Design a protein with these regions (language model features):
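Glycan-recognition and catalytic cores of secretory/periplasmic carbohydrate-active enzymes
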Residues: 1-247
Length: 247
């Protein structure tokens, strides 16, 4: 539903934003497991005791993660406006990446295309995939969308700044800025990422490359620009963006 500025509830937008961020922080930091999924049968267990999830034959539903990814994307898009920094918060991308690779990517059967409903956390357990005409779960409906969305969050932009969020082989054609960029990588099997600007106008451009919170210290990665190694200091464990300016 659309909300106009004449709507009496428009003034509550800040409250809604605060509530959404509180919910996101609670789920991601206190209710989620390593794959980025959460809950069993869409019910949270105690935040300080995951035993029931580890013992259950069911587990996080992919449609829960699907909705968390949607929320994450919206909060990311609005994050620079909330604190007036005009800078998106890369912490949202850290979670998006974790859930995308560890839960969503593994949720489709590679040969017959069935979709996973539950992803059990029980050690040594198995997953059940949907079958045509017998399995139309909620996670099948959202699953049809999940695997068409791998390209939608790789890049983002604000004004003349381009953000490289995810390390996925891709090509970007930014028509407004006259920039064509190619990304080559085998991530997560290999940590090397190559960004090549194939076409560029004379317009001012800032390239913001995400340094994930899991990247560790500066000793754990190296950056080469036009064949020359560059040194950048980062805080270990803190997700950030590394700026490269072209005037």
């Amino acid at each position: 539903a659309e909300v106009s500025k004449d709507d009496k509830d428009w003034n509550h937008a800040a409250e809604w934003d605060h509530a959404a961020r509180f919910f996101w922080n609670t789920v991601v930091n206190h209710r989620s497991v390593c794959i980025g999924g959460n809950s069993v049968r869409e019910h949270f267990h105690p935040s300080d005791n995951f035993t029931s999830m580890l013992n259950d034959v069911q587990g996080p539903e992919t449609c829960n993660t699907y909705n968390m990814l949607r929320l994450t994307k919206m909060l990311y898009q609005n994050s620079g406006d909330v604190d007036n920094s005009n800078k998106p918060d890369p912490r949202y991308v850290d979670y998006y990446e974790r859930a995308l690779y560890n839960h969503i990517l593994s949720s489709q059967e590679p040969d017959k295309g069935g979709f996973v409903y539950f992803t059990p956390m029980r050690p040594g357990h198995y997953r059940v995939y949907s079958q045509p005409e017998t399995s139309m779960w909620c996670c099948v409906g959202s699953g049809l969308e999940n695997h068409t969305k791998y390209g939608e969050f790789i890049y983002a932009h604000r004004q003349d700044t381009l953000y490289v969020n995810l390390f996925i082989p891709s090509q970007l054609n930014w028509k407004e800025q006259g920039v064509t960029l190619t990304q080559e990588t085998l991530f997560p099997d290999d940590g090397k990422v190559t960004l090549r600007i194939d076409k560029a106008s004379k317009k001012k451009l800032t390239l913001m490359i995400r340094i994930p919170g899991w990247a560790g210290s500066s000793k754990d990665y190296a950056i080469t620009i036009n064949g020359q190694k560059k040194k950048y200091a980062i805080r270990p464990g803190v997700s950030t963006y590394l700026p490269i300016h072209r005037k």
